[in-house]
Amino acid sequence: SYHGGLIGVVAAAWGCTRRQGVSLREAADLVVPAAPLGYTFGRIGNFINGELYGRVTASPIGMVFPLAPDRALRHPSQLYEALLEGVALFALLWSLRRRPFPRGAMLALYLVGYGTARFLVEFFREPDAHIGYTWAGLTRGQLLCAGMIAAGLILYRFLRRLPQSPPAGLRSPSPRRA
């Protein structure tokens, strides 16, 4: 559901920025670095609710989740996601935000960073019961994340080929004439 939601957010952002006469690439560069903080709190909420728990483990950090179908110790994968997709990705994007990247590069870097973090965490997360494992022992989430990583790399390569004008900054659009 996250991957579809991301497509919806990008489509809505494209529509809003276009309607307001604002550059989507500049808006993304401003907003995207802070977006991972939302995952941190969302995944902590998943942990508190005992949902989206991890795979069975013998690790000393394993926990029993009341909503799991058994009383086995499981990885607290929600916390792994909060740390990797949330805190670590935020720190990375925030530290890179003022570097001389092409306009819009934050979205490409986000796609690669989130896709990589989620792909790795999926090895510890219990797959959705109605989906299970798909191709080559990977979860659907991992396959979708591989697509995100590829899309991020392609987008970055595309952005590098565009002519780079100095950013105009986000400003109030001029009033439209009737």
Model-derived features with residue positions:
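A feature for loop-to-transmembrane-helix boundaries and adjacent hydrophobic helices
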Residues: 1-178
